[in-house]
Curated annotation (Swiss-Prot):
Entry EC number(s): 6.1.1.14
Pfam families: HGTP_anticodon (PF03129), tRNA-synt_2b (PF00587)
Protein name, per record: Glycine--tRNA ligase
Provenance organism: Leptospira interrogans serogroup Icterohaemorrhagiae serovar copenhageni (strain Fiocruz L1-130)
Ligand binding (substrate): 104, 175, 222-226, 332-336
Subcellular location, record wording: Cytoplasm
Enzyme class: ligase
Gene that encodes it: glyQS
Length: 464
């Protein structure tokens, strides 16, 4: 119990700094909110954009074998029948008959029995364990009040059409992948890409989660960075290994996440998705424990075969070199943007005890992803210091998001930027007016040095 309370407490600290410093706000807050919805504030948006741009750079722009796509959120409902989501995209649901609380049965059992306990359990076995154990409802505390577990489809249903008579029941997409599969033939035709190659996209997905929780880790509306890599059957294992390593290296070398906070976990056969022959998760050590950050799945030729069957379209690839046609196999690295956001904030967050006995909160983001690259401070709001500061600020703004801050004592301004994760703070003082140098303070070490204004832009550029 003590450990769980400690984990809950540390997550609350993350939530607090995100709200206090404008990273994440509760959704619809002035109307009392809407559970499990969040709005990303000024610094949260900057962090998200930096993460997405960094992903796009390394998964599209720096690779000749990958192109981009932006497919529709709303798709013909037959797509989801073909993909198997209508019949298979379910989680086990139980209700408390006393307080009407709805609970995801497998996660509830793992909370009670330990991580991994529910892996591979059938609904019948879950019902047996719940009945024999006589668990208490986590909401009202009553025992023996749970309904039998049943499948609950996670897709959001809506209507497409102007009137009830001609409206069509459709779904908000639960993953971005299907839009890529539908456009496989278009991309091959228009870009003349040869296998092996990938199609990547960033976009919103929606899942009606039974137990949406743990801040932005599990939400009903979320953003994905997915890539479907098409390869010749028989080569998928080699590519699978390549993408697991490539993704892990990107997280550590580019995003800057500590290696000790990451691990690779291979799925047991019983927990594989209905479309996968093998999946490995890159997990991050969140405040609440290890959780999936990035899933790399070998989807075989399942999706293209299904869409071929249901649509009647020939989705085989014509291999000109080998003079044969085949349905490509697919390896999919699928990353949740919101989970990555929470991972980098958690990884960067530190309450540091200073030599003078004070404590400072600091977010040690890599400069590549920091929402603010540098902040410019005039020491005083007079004697030409603001004018000189504005001049420096305007010049540095070409490097990225630079902030101008003239409010309060310098020490308080440093602390504010530490909580935002700003790598460098630049103070314009009276010596600046004499020798055209500024004080640059580095976030992590808090060390300071004087830099000539005419060298400042290049000095920063080399470190961002």
């Amino acid at each position: 119990m003590e450990k769980k309370e400690s984990l809950d407490s540390s997550l609350k600290e993350i939530v607090s700094v995100c709200k206090r410093r404008g990273f994440v706000y509760p959704g619809s807050e002035i109307y009392g909110g809407l559970s499990n919805t969040f709005d990303y504030g000024p610094y949260g948006v900057e962090l998200l954009q930096n993460l997405k741009q960094l992903w796009w750079k390394y998964f599209v722009h720096l690779r000749e074998d990958i192109v981009g796509l932006d497919s529709s959120i709303l798709l013909n409902p037959k797509v989801w029948e073909a993909s198997g989501h209508v019949s298979n995209f379910n989680d086990p649901l139980i209700d408390c008959k006393n307080c009407k609380t709805r609970i995801r049965a497998d996660k509830f059992l793992e909370d009670q029995k330990g991580e991994g306990f529910a892996t591979g359990l059938t609904l019948e076995k879950m019902n047996q364990v719940i009945k024999e154990s006589n668990f208490a409802c986590p909401n009202c505390g009553q025992r023996g009040t749970f309904t039998e577990a049943r499948d609950f489809n996670l897709m959001f249903k809506t209507s497409h059409g102007a009137s009830a008579e001609d409206s069509l029941d459709i779904y908000l997409r639960p993953e971005t992948a299907q839009g890529i599969f539908l456009n496989f033939k278009n991309v091959v035709s228009t870009t003349r890409r040869k296998i092996p190659f990938g199609i990547a996209q960033i976009g919103k997905s929606f899942r009606n989660e039974i137990m949406a929780r743990q801040f932005v880790f599990r939400t009903r509306e979320f953003e994905q960075m997915e890539m479907e890599f098409f390869c010749e059957p028989g080569t998928q294992k080699e590519w699978f290994s390549h993408w697991v390593n490539y993704c892990m290296n990107w997280l550590t070398e580019q995003v800057g996440i500590k290696k000790e906070n990451l691990r690779v976990r291979e799925h047991e056969k019983e927990e594989l998705s209905f479309y996968s022959e093998g999946t490995s998760d890159i997990e991050f050590k969140y405040n609440f424990g290890w959780g999936e950050l990035w899933g790399i799945a070998s989807r075989t030729d399942y999706d293209l075969n299904q869409h071929q069957k249901f649509s009647g379209e020939d989705l085989k690839y014509q291999d000109q070199v080998q003079n044969k046609k085949y349905v490509p196999f697919v390896v999919e690295p699928a990353l949740g943007v919101n989970r990555l956001f929470l991972a980098v904030v958690t990884d960067a967050y530190e309450e540091e005890k200073l030599p003078d006995g004070e404590t400072r909160t600091v977010l040690r983001f890599s400069p590549k992803i920091a929402p603010v690259k540098a902040a410019v401070f005039p020491l005083m709001k007079k004697d030409g210091l603001p004018e000189k500061s504005r001049e420096i600020f305007a010049d540095l703004s070409k490097l990225g998001n630079i902030e101008y801050d003239d409010g309060g004592a310098i020490g308080k301004r440093y602390r504010r930027q530490d909580e935002i994760g700003t790598p460098f703070c630049i103070t314009v003082d009276y010596d600046t007016l004499k020798d055209n140098t500024v004080t640059v303070r580095e976030r992590d070490s808090m060390s300071q040095e004087r830099i000539a204004v005419n060298q400042l832009k290049n000095w920063l550029f080399e470190r961002l």
